[in-house]
Amino acid sequence: MAGHSKWANIQHRKGKQDKLRSKMFSKLAKEITVAAKMGDPDPDKNPRLRLAVKAAKAVSMPKDVIERAIKKSQGGDAEDYSEIRYEGYGPNGIAIIVETMTDNVNRTASNVRSYFTKYGGNLGTTGSVSFMFDRVGEITYKPEAGDADTVMMAAIEAGAEDVESDEEGHWIYCGDTSLNEVSEALEKVLGESEEAKLVWKPQNRTNVDLETAQKLMKLIDALEEDDDVQTVTGNFDIPEDVAAKLDA
């Protein structure tokens, strides 16, 4: 399947989220600060900020931390961050997109390049792999939101373009510019979503073997542990039998 990736769930099972929890908070706080600085500090009047706050709440970020991040955007000493996308190939030619938010472009470029080189990849130029992905909105619901048919009908009515459902939940996709609109329409029918965000959705995914999966995880771990990196996306998936060996 080209949309929802099983490897995100593998990361959860490996306890990786606990390890990255503090980093996740700092990355989300950075996104909140930038979103608030670029627009209105009121989430109700700023779609990007509203989505950032929603993402923070989804991982139980304390309310005072969220408010502090918004307040920071209004101060005269708020850092200026540049949003830069890096593209390249990981082990076995897997396409990877890295989104960063940095106050030092040279540092970030050097670090990202070194991770690709160290872990069997090759950093390319902007546009070198993004043509293999679609920029879309992704809205996530837990299985309890309804059965696949119910969610599909609600998604169509809300203006979504695609839906994927399995035993772990529902993933609803829409145009990148209509994420806020579709998310609000769905909320009236299905209740509040677990997450709503912009993603790079691979047009096709490649199932990888154990050796490739291990190499990819090392590269992705290194990237995600960098404070300047916000998201990492690849056009691969890890079959369940390989995932079981990764967990071992």
Swiss-Prot record:
GO terms for cellular component: cytosol. The keyword Heme does not apply. The keyword Transcription applies. It holds the Pfam family Transcrip_reg. It comes from the Bacteria. GO terms for biological process: regulation of DNA-templated transcription. One of its GO terms (molecular function) is DNA binding. Residues 1-21 are annotated as: Disordered. It is found in: Cytoplasm. InterPro entries: Integrase-like_N (IPR017856), TACO1_YebC-like_2nd/3rd_dom (IPR048300), TACO1_YebC_N (IPR049083), Transcrip_reg_TACO1-like (IPR002876), Transcrip_reg_TACO1-like_dom3 (IPR026564), YebC-like (IPR029072). Keywords: Cytoplasm, DNA-binding, Transcription, Transcription regulation. Belongs to the TACO1 family. This is Probable transcriptional regulatory protein RSKD131_2012. It comes from Cereibacter sphaeroides (strain KD131 / KCTC 12085). The lineage of its organism: Bacteria, Pseudomonadati, Pseudomonadota, Alphaproteobacteria, Rhodobacterales.
